[in-house]
Amino acid sequence: MKNIKKGILNCMKRYIFLSSIILIFIIFGIKLGIIISNSSYYEKKLEEKTNIYVSGVSSPRGRILDTNGKVLVDNIGVKTIYYNKIKGIKTIEELEIAWSLEKIIDVKEASIDELKEYYLITNNNGKDLITSDEYRLYEERKIGNETLEKLKLERITDDMINYDTDTKKVAHIYNLMNKGYIYSKKEIVKNVSEEEFAKVIESNIPGVTGEITWERTYLYGDTLKNIFGKVGPITKENKDYYLNEGYELTDTVGLSYLEKEYEEYLKGEKAKYKVESDYKLVKIEDEKKGNDLVLSIDIDLQMKVDEILRDKITLGKKYGNTEYFKDSYAIISNPLSGAILAISGQRLNDDNAFSDISLNTINKSYTMGSSVKGATIAVGYKYNLITPGTYINDACVKLEFIPQKCSFKRLGKVNDLTALANSSNYYQYMIAINLTGNKYKPNMKLNATKEHFKTYRDMLASFGLGVKTEIDLPGEQTGIIGSTVADDLLLNLAIGQYDTYTPVELLQYINSVASGKRMSLNLMKEIKNKDKIILENKINILNDVDLNEESLTRIREGLRLVLSEGTGKFYVPQGLDFAGKTGTSESFLDTNNDGKVDTATISSSFAGFYPSEDPKFSIVVITPNVSHKNGKTDAFYFGASKITKDIVNYLNEKY
């Protein structure tokens, strides 16, 4: 019985052993089959591990176009000379290459440090500069190689490196030839002439190539150039971000504004090279141009608006009290989408030349005055502080210890519509007073609180005032929100004379009045590659205006009366179905740069849209410091009105 059991056990062991062997062969066969069937994949992986690949020096970025397809920003090929190190090349051979290049191309002379390095490589590595005792200390490891090299450099005198001009240039070329990784291309000189470029190529100098790199060119000069933004090398602050995104530190990227905002679409793909064993570069992938950025900007309209601003600033300077008047802004958009058609800022400098300050539209703020009353009157509607259509007598308000506050003139009887049409401050004051729970009486105290200010600011923000517009330009700032709580400042806030707003905030506000919705402003219309649309802008609604449609309709009607019979009667051609609001405000300047405001000025503004129903255009115009506080002149009145009228005339003529 024992023998039988033992035999059975031995058979089982043999069976398990044979089964294991068979299973191992099956697994091996499956693995071998997988490897054979995927041989190209593994060959590629092996190649990636055993070969070195490098990118080309640059690739063309995508163009920037206007809404009609006109090219605004393009790329220009720059003829550039490069050196690719040859495996096993000797120093004397590289110096010969440098001398050959120096005879063809013009480069700057070497720096002192470069000249000292040149001296060492051409003088037995400076061995004569080190004493025998110092060499002994080095051999005894009492001083290191770093100390030895430092001593050599310190002992090279000015006379030793007093080379002629040609030699100094050769020293600089040699230094450029030996920068960076051994297998990477070294830029020797860029923007060479056609003749120099041809000579370098014809000379067939070992390791030297002539290639085209790409730089931005602006087809309309400085127009919108600061809005486009800059491109350049990766900055130290952004190094980690770009490296994580797969960039190389030598890459050119968008550094600001539109170039930065749409970097991921505008960037091109550089050519790819395989590094052969002799360091020769073999191209395996061609470069690819980036996608084109199409803007909502109409460049013809943009240039016309720029021209109008320059003309009207120049004209205004002929009037009195305009010492501080030098800037003007105008923005035009589609109020139902937020698409910007023109965005302009012009400044007259002391040398009577103009500069483009269009970026101030997103990062510089002003008190806008009565032009924001379309939003402040909304507080009265929402909280039932006014009765639509009911008339009151326009008058002045006198609070305790505060000088009386009035409209710019006595307006007689006004209701909500005519108060907007004729810019009654008194009507707005009554809304603010009613908000505090008081009934007006002379020399009263309102006891205004933070909550009263918040009520106004929440409503203003609902229209886009005091908050970012979310325009697709990095660096947008909001205006200044006053921190002091006081009775008179609540009244000031109600007439747009306390907080400050940027020009784009004013634009978003008037668009919100027109549509009933606060939409982000945008410059990007679409991004495309040839005829294929990669990304298309979509209307981005940030919030609905915090007001019912009946009240919004009432506000629009009041703004229509502004242009037909009120303070804006001469801002646009008569008979045009236009809605808008004029504004004047008190501003303060620091004229002697001592950090303290010392001069009171008057600024004017306008915000409007037309037609008043289903509008096609919205316009804001701002003319800061157009006059002195102590003397309103014709220049004050002409500021925003003349600019607005000229822009509207052009729009009617062309569109």
Q: What is each stretch, according to the model?
A:
Residues 71-74, 272-286, 297, 301, ...:
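Beta-lactam-recognizing serine transpeptidase/beta-lactamase-like catalytic domain environment
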Residues 43-56, 301-323:
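Short, basic/aromatic recognition patches
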Residues 88, 102, 527-532, 645:
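Short edge-strand/loop segments of extracellular domains
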Residues 625-640:
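A short acidic/glycine-rich loop-to-helix N-cap element
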Residues 41, 308-317, 348, 439, ...:
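Structural motif corresponding to the C-terminal cap of alpha-helices
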Residues 534-536, 638-655:
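Short, gly/Ser/Thr-rich active-site loops of penicillin-recognizing serine hydrolases
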Residues 2-260, 264-281, 285, 328-329, ...:
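Membrane-proximal periplasmic segments of bacterial cell-envelope enzymes
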Residues 92-99, 103, 198, 202, ...:
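Solvent-exposed, polar/charged alpha-helical surfaces in well-ordered, non-transmembrane soluble domains
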